[in-house]
Design a protein with these regions (language model features):
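Cytoplasmic/organellar membrane-interface segments at the starts of transmembrane helices
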Residues: 361-369, 424-526, 535-559, 563-567, ...
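Hydrophobic transmembrane alpha-helices and their helix-loop junctions in integral membrane proteins
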Residues: 88-105, 109-130, 139-449, 458, ...
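Hydrophobic alpha-helical transmembrane segments
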Residues: 68-83, 202-217, 408-421, 506-526
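Transmembrane helix-loop-helix hairpins at membrane boundaries of multipass inner-membrane proteins
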Residues: 2-3, 13-109, 178-201, 206, ...
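N-terminal signal-anchor/start-transfer transmembrane helix
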Residues: 4-21, 217, 221, 281
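Membrane-helix interface motif
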Residues: 46-53, 178-188, 381-398, 482-500, ...
């Protein structure tokens, strides 16, 4: 595990030199590192499933910080996603960028470094180490989103992502410290095992978990922090395909999955994650249905799906855990595929606006098939991986409702998932139609031909190596649908950490049951809504576009900017005497104030002076200082300042420190 981290760090340092030598083909070279790491991790599956694959290297013993790495079944699955999709995206970059694209060396270095940091995050077995990798991914995402730094939108989006995720990370750090100090350990494996026993520590554990969850929901773009993710679509498409579909935004989901076996019964867990999960799934799907930009459509769809995953994993049962992770695997495959598809369309046609795209499918038939399969998987259409995962979720939630425990939360989860899934079908159909369909003149913003119909969008031929990564992910989506058993088998050791026994099995066909009927109803209703897209569009666009959270964020940022201007105007006056006065007043007032706040000495015990000589020296210093303020000439002021120095030397001498007095005099 440590070797994988070192390899990614090393290739990131060498990347600029490789790009200087090989040009954009260097993406293939650096892609070899996550690809080789993927193969190596894949071969270690047996050790991961047994829970014996771990490394512990002392780092800062005084801070109880060690490089503790551990790959269990959950981390193993996440590692394969991070490394495998990372390698494919890097290979995709070799055709996405041209030879004259600027800063490809630094971009490649940052992207492969991000893959290494994300791998470190999922294998970290120390909360403090996990936080370090967490923040590394934040910084690298800031750099990657702001790749096109000459554009204001890219700079603004990168700064917004940095502010939101950093604020969540700092909140999470407080939770990390509270939990670690309360438990007496920062080892994640030990903390999860101790979860039920830590409940006796009182509300401190509930507060710690709530703070950790704040970090998770900001990283995974749940409401009200969702708006940074759509704004981050200013990044190059490979960044969106990797960070915002398969890795970074999954960090919060992973943290919830990691903590769920031990802390799903804490006070803040269910209310917080249920509310945010359902709200995010429904809201994200609702907004996705009215997007014209293909990347924004996928971005809001990702927000919706992240809420879906958090909602399912928060249930805290073995079946829900398995279904939630099955959903995560399926989402990583189809969403990365769709982002790569958008990148190809944008690259070959020059636009992502569905109003300017028409008949692209006839010119790119392979890409059309890829997009249909991936979108169908996203919508939960059989026989693809997304259907297997979604039916598993519906079956689990339906079972909870039918258990007749009187739990209203079970009904809220099920109804929220059904509504959000209908929206998912709608925006999935909108994606395929918008990217590849034939547009009518009433909708399209295209030049018209002699017959009055919009002309088709001209598209260049996409190289096979450009389309290949999307094809590979599509094949995996199909295989996952027909053969989900390996994913289930891989996750069972982690699922066994939950209380209770897992009864769910991932399969393409469970017979005709309630979950299947609900799935078919969702698909039918979603397609019906898409067929009436004009009416739907009229309803959607009648609503405000900016959410209250985004408005509040912008108002806060604007207020901070105004405050900074005001403070600067008050303090930066160009006057040296003013600056010195502020420094001296602060240096005197603050320590004295703190002294009297914490320990006020009795007035009777205070001594003004030990001798008359000290009073004379003090009077000399004070008098010289006052005279400096009244001095009209600089030379006289310098002489008076020297008098204060001699007065201080006299004080040292009277206190029995002739060496200090001599030093001060000289």
């Amino acid at each position: 595990m440590l070797a994988v981290l070192i390899a990614h760090a090393a290739i990131a340092l060498l990347a600029p030199l490789l790009f200087t030598r090989f040009g954009r083909s260097a993406f293939y070279v650096i892609a070899a590192v996550p690809a080789a790491s993927f193969i190596w991790v894949l071969l270690q599956g047996g050790a991961a499933h047994s829970g014996q694959w771990q490394q512990v290297i002392p780092w800062l013993p005084t801070m109880d910080l060690a490089i503790a790495l551990r790959t269990d079944s959950l981390a193993w699955v996440m590692s394969l996603i991070v490394l495998g999709i990372g390698a494919l995206v890097l290979a995709y970059c070799a055709r996405y960028f041209s030879e004259d694209s600027p800063d490809t060396g630094s971009f490649g270095a940052q992207l492969v470094a991000f893959a290494g940091a994300m791998y470190g995050l999922v294998v970290a077995d120390d909360l403090l180490l996990l936080f370090i990798f967490w923040e590394i991914t934040t910084v690298l995402s800031f750099l990657l989103i702001g790749y096109a730094r000459v554009r204001l939108s890219a700079r603004r989006a990168s700064m917004q992502a940095l502010i939101i995720t950093t604020a969540g990370g700092l909140t999470m750090l407080v939770g990390v410290i509270l939990l670690g100090q309360s438990a007496g350990t920062y080892r994640i494996s030990e903390l999860v095992a101790m979860g039920p026993q830590l409940a006796s520590h009182g509300p401190i554990i509930d507060v710690a978990i709530a703070l950790l969850l704040v970090g998770a929901v900001t990283k995974s773009a749940l409401i009200p922090f969702h708006f940074w993710l759509p704004e981050a679509m200013a990044a190059p498409t490979p960044v969106s395909a990797y960070l915002h579909a398969a890795s970074m935004v999954k960090a919060g989901v992973y943290l919830v999955a990691r903590l769920a076996p031990g802390y799903s019964d804490t006070a803040a867990w269910q209310p917080m994650l249920l509310t945010l999960g359902v709200g995010t799934m429904v809201f994200g799907g609702w907004v996705a249905m009215r997007q014209y930009d293909l990347k924004l459509l996928l971005a809001y769809g990702t927000v919706s799906q992240l809420g879906f995953m958090i909602l399912v994993l928060s249930v805290g049962t073995p079946d829900a855990a398995l279904a939630g992770m099955a959903l995560l695997v399926g989402h990583a495959l189809f969403k990365a595929t769709l982002f790569l598809t958008v990148g190809i369309i944008d690259h070959e046609t020059g636009t992502r606006d569905i109003r300017k795209l028409s008949e692209v499918g006839r010119q790119m038939p392979v890409l059309l098939v890829v997009a249909i399969i991936a979108a169908a998987s996203m919508a939960g259409v059989p026989p693809f991986g997304g259907f297997v995962a979604k039916e598993a979720v519906l079956g689990t939630l339906l079972h909870d409702v039918q258990a007749d425990t009187g739990d209203a939360l079970a009904w809220i989860r099920l109804l929220g998932v059904i509504l959000g899934s209908v929206f998912t079908v709608v925006y999935s159909a909108r994606f395929v139609w918008g990217a590849f369909g034939v547009k009518r003149s009433a909708f399209a913003q295209l030049p018209t031909g002699e017959d009055g119909r919009p002309m088709r969008t001209p598209a260049h031929h996409a190289a096979r190596s450009f389309v290949a990564p999307a094809v590979v992910l599509t094949v995996l989506t199909i295989v996952y649908g027909f053969v989900p058993g390996p994913v289930e088998h891989s996750l069972l050791p982690w699922v066994g950490e939950f209380a209770g026994e897992a009864t769910l099995h991932l399969a393409l066909w469970h017979g005709i049951n309630g979950a299947l009927l609900i799935s078919l109803g969702i698909i039918a209703l979603g397609l019906l809504m898409h067929a009436n897209r004009r009416t739907l569009a009229a309803v959607l666009h009648s609503l405000p576009h900016m959410t209250p959270a985004e408005r509040i964020y912008r108002e806060v940022i604007d207020s901070l900017d105004k405050l900074a201007v005001w403070v600067t105007g008050k303090t930066q006056r160009g006057s040296l005497s003013f600056y010195l006065s502020v420094i001296l007043i602060t240096a005197i007032v603050v320590p004295v104030t703190v002294l009297f706040l914490y320990e006020t000495p009795p007035l009777g015990s205070m001594r003004i002076a030990d001798s008359w000589g000290q009073l004379v020296a003090a009077a000399l210093i004070i008098g010289a200082c006052l005279a400096v303020l009244r001095a009209g000439k600089r030379f006289l002021a310098v002489l008076l300042v020297s008098v204060t120095g001699y007065g201080l030397a006299l004080t040292f001498a009277l206190q029995g420190a002739p060496d200090l007095a001599l030093t001060q005099t000289l």
